[in-house]
Amino acid sequence: MVEVEEKHYTIVKRNGMFVPFNQDRIFQALEAAFRDTRSLETSSPLPKDLEESIAQITHKVVKEVLAKISEGQVVTVERIQDLVESQLYISGLQDVARDYIVYRDQRKAERGNSSSIIAIIRRDGGSAKFNPMKISAALEKAFRATLQINGMTPPATLSEINDLTLRIVEDVLSLHGEEAINLEEIQDIVEKQLMVAGYYDVAKNYILYREARARARANKDQDGQEEFVPQEETYVVQKEDGTTYLLRKTDLEKRFSWACKRFPKTTDSQLLADMAFMNLYSGIKEDEVTTACIMAARANIEREPDYAFIAAELLTSSLYEETLGCSSQDPNLSEIHKKHFKEYILNGEEYRLNPQLKDYDLDALSEVLDLSRDQQFSYMGVQNLYDRYFNLHEGRRLETAQIFWMRVSMGLALNEGEQKNFWAITFYNLLSTFRYTPATPTLFNSGMRHSQLSSCYLSTVKDDLSHIYKVISDNALLSKWAGGIGNDWTDVRATGAVIKGTNGKSQGVIPFIKVANDTAIAVNQGGKRKGAMCVYLENWHLDYEDFLELRKNTGDERRRTHDINTASWIPDLFFKRLEKKGMWTLFSPDDVPGLHEAYGLEFEKLYEEYERKVESGEIRLYKKVEAEVLWRKMLSMLYETGHPWITFKDPSNIRSNQDHVGVVRCSNLCTEILLNCSESETAVCNLGSINLVEHIRNDKLDEEKLKETISIAIRILDNVIDLNFYPTPEAKQANLTHRAVGLGVMGFQDVLYELNISYASQEAVEFSDECSEIIAYYAILASSLLAKERGTYASYSGSKWDRGYLPLDTIELLKETRGEHNVLVDTSSKKDWTPVRDTIQKYGMRNSQVMAIAPTATISNIIGVTQSIEPMYKHLFVKSNLSGEFTIPNTYLIKKLKELGLWDAEMLDDLKYFDGSLLEIERIPNHLKKLFLTAFEIEPEWIIECTSRRQKWIDMGVSLNLYLAEPDGKKLSNMYLTAWKKGLKTTYYLRSQAATSVEKSFIDINKRGIQPRWMKNKSASTSIVVERKTTPVCSMEEGCESCQ
């Protein structure tokens, strides 16, 4: 049993009294319930099995109680009994639980007839029950105001408050017994006990507060406002300048009424005012009142998604007050906003803005600012912008959302010459309507003095000590300005290789990767988020088996890298050996020159030549392993640690547009960027994503609108290259020479919901194909037309574009090296590509690469859509990031359930109980269950096939997460082999089900009659028919945000 030092823990009885927590009473209550249910005599000893059961349940309840007390929660007797009841059900003891509930109801009725309650005489002559919890609450408010506590009250302070409350209650009882007592007398006792305990400052503030309240009751407001009603509780609020004012609940009701005006049928301003008022205290700061209001709205999002817009409205109004000095209700808001924008830009050098922004026509730009677009944001979007994206000066935010979008747009149009005002307005209208969003580094830095706008950097590390540390130093510089990094380490010699200069033996690549890991965590991204990188190693490297274990939680910490990502760079030959159950040879790179640069049939020829040198004794440092054994170890580590990710070397190179000027040696932090890198070039890519949701009209893609969006987006991405601040000369050289950009998408799952298409269907596959083809068509065309205006990129001559290849054409090249049976890719198309081919032949291309689908974790949160091409993770879950925790309900699901009359508190409890899944909720129709399958309920083949259809059109890669609901080695192997055969170039995270789930202790299992899943004989999900497409598979047995 959990040992409890009882003097340190108190709980609250039903009459409000604080008493010591006594775990023996839980055991005794459980014993009584068991004896009653099992008809056991009180005098007879308990059977051993029952005694053990009672002890186990007591242990679990005590553990939960202590956890809640340690978090600063006030635990009541009722709450403990709820926990006991819940644990009885979880333990399968429903009969005991029922008797326990009956016993509780009887005791409740008996208590209702009791008359031994002290009465308080209020100031208006009325009476109320004496409640010590109100004393405790008043004390806590006084302590918080005096000690200037923000956030949760520290446990030590709560303990002091509990002790004081006990002494005050004892005084009240000893002085008055069961007689009625005046409220003023209780407050006198509170003052006395504060002084006796030595809390003089708290007592002083408490006395001043009582005097202020007395004056407010005695006098009318001097400005002619209505008199404070004595019965209405008020709080003293401290303004930033030190002055104070009194706040009533009716004041909060007015604030919430304004915020809720757009949603009168779905939101309740009175409810929010009640909730917010409960969290106030005397002496509270003005910004804490705003926080309490926002938290009240935020707490209701899970049951009604419209509260996300209420919370956003409240935060936006607070932002206006901070930035503009007026609230959202000010009739002159628009004019104040325009004036502030112009002053902000004109004084921008003081605020780290690019001084060239002053050269714009600020009057014209200010007229375009549209504050009504702020209403598009949900709470998560505004909070993300507020916490990390808006420009700050001495702790004060200088931007509203619309000024932020305009600052970014102005920064992106600086190279547009005489047309820069036109393009700044055009860019603003695109960004502020959520049609397209640049990646986070661009949002951070566009229009700023140091305009580092690029998302991804890829570099290779040479087998030379000075170059190793140069790359590590470069990593620090790149990460400082919010870039995500991919490092190729394959060229560094393996453990045991001879160092010719010293005649010593190399320690291999692992110690150097450890140094890179420590550098990544030492440099955070512009002070706004953690630095992030991914290291790549080909799986023929002799240190590869050690590389597999870099993310393990056990072993030598000097050979562990817990803070960076790892990825395997795998040639096709390995999978061919795996298919034939052949052997695989590991080499030190210094013994096999040219192997890392080779791919396809050339790699196979060279690799086999080196294997013959092993047999002849020319190469002595090597290791032979069974390909199948190594593959199992790769998958085992992937499942255990989430790393190394699986990426495919040959399709990344064979299908590369730039095969004439180098080799793709690795991918980036999020595995979607595939660019050449070398000792003289650090590959750079600039990212942005189209919001598909804004391009659906009449239940189909609006092709004309999408064409316009893509054309402007490609222009923005190309501008980034010329406007960018380059931390290293190698990055500048690569970006200006090849001008790679990565246009992606987000909101794919949202669109499927709007079109009533299940992700697990052929319809989703076809839509993925159609959508990707349209985007590729207009993206390539836009880059070519931009070449007409601005000229081709420097290394265009000899590229695949120049040789007449489009991305779709390169699949045939992959088939030539792999064999058609290993390239199971649909190559159909619907559009006539002749105009695109003719335009490229005539004008060339402005950008070497044009498309890549990044994860978009952050920017999709800003605009309120699902990430990238990801399926819905859960229909109700809590998301954590640097801005805090956010409850995420699936608004599309709730809308459907409302239409069917099924959305209620019970359904919300069901969603929590079943961890955000619908499959076992009996009253949800099967057609909705199929439409709203979560990521772990969709067979991986569907996700892979949808991605395969995209990948055929995309010239770089797709950041693709894969999901595995249960540990299954064969299924895991088949999943990745299918991805390889389906032509994917890379994969990203392997997501597995978390061991934890939604908090269920507040769910009344008995009342709702939920049958726990462990008691089910037949799942409600067994009647669902999910369309599945047969895919040939092998039968072998068994978070960065730079791209976001």
Swiss-Prot record:
| Nucleotide-binding among keywords | yes
Q: How does it assemble?
A: Tetramer of two alpha and two beta subunits.
Q: What is this protein called?
A: Ribonucleoside-diphosphate reductase subunit alpha
Q: Where is this site: Allosteric effector binding?
A: 463, 493
State the species of origin.
Chlamydia pneumoniae (Chlamydophila pneumoniae)
Its domain of life reads Bacteria
User: Catalytic positions?
Assistant: 668, 670, 672
Pfam families in UniProt: ATP-cone, Ribonuc_red_lgC, Ribonuc_red_lgN
Which pairs of positions does the record mark as disulfide bonds? 456-685
EC assignment: 1.17.4.1
Q: Which reaction does it catalyse?
A: a 2'-deoxyribonucleoside 5'-diphosphate + [thioredoxin]-disulfide + H2O = a ribonucleoside 5'-diphosphate + [thioredoxin]-dithiol
**Residues covered by the ATP-cone domain:** 9-111, 118-217, 235-325
Q: Where is this site: Interacts with thioredoxin/glutaredoxin?
A: 1040, 1043
Q: Which family does it belong to?
A: Belongs to the ribonucleoside diphosphate reductase large chain family.
